[in-house]
């Protein structure tokens, strides 16, 4: 899918291109493009982490009568919360880059997106350990 920007340049919004890092030598110039690339990396890294946690919960609670349902609900709520936060923080990062007049390399979008997931993991574990 391609969207046309205000300066009549084409913005590439292909999920396959973002995830395969095809865009060697290109830069992300528009706010939409920066937000989309950062958000997709945050989305898929969060999906990977929550998928692994869900499988672990499902295996550990398989003999529990309501364990499967509880694990699905917990993983779903955690994933939706992290994706909502990723939308907001991706827009903030892209906005800062845009206001500063900087272009973003595709690898920077990867670092920002996966970095959001890593920070979410660190904050989540520190909050859990504080309650024990």
From Swiss-Prot:
It is found in: Cell membrane. The gene is Tmem170b. InterPro entries: Transmembrane_pr_170. The chain crosses the membrane at residues 38-58, 69-89, 105-125. PANTHER family: SD17342P, TRANSMEMBRANE PROTEIN 170B. This is Transmembrane protein 170B. One of its GO terms (biological process) is negative regulation of canonical Wnt signaling pathway. It comes from the Eukaryota. Its main location: membrane. Residues 59-68, 126-132 are cytoplasmic. Keywords: Cell membrane, Glycoprotein, Membrane, Transmembrane, Transmembrane helix. Signal peptide: none annotated. It is a multi-pass membrane protein. Interacts with CTNNB1. Belongs to the TMEM170 family. Glycans are attached at residue 12. GO terms for cellular component: plasma membrane.
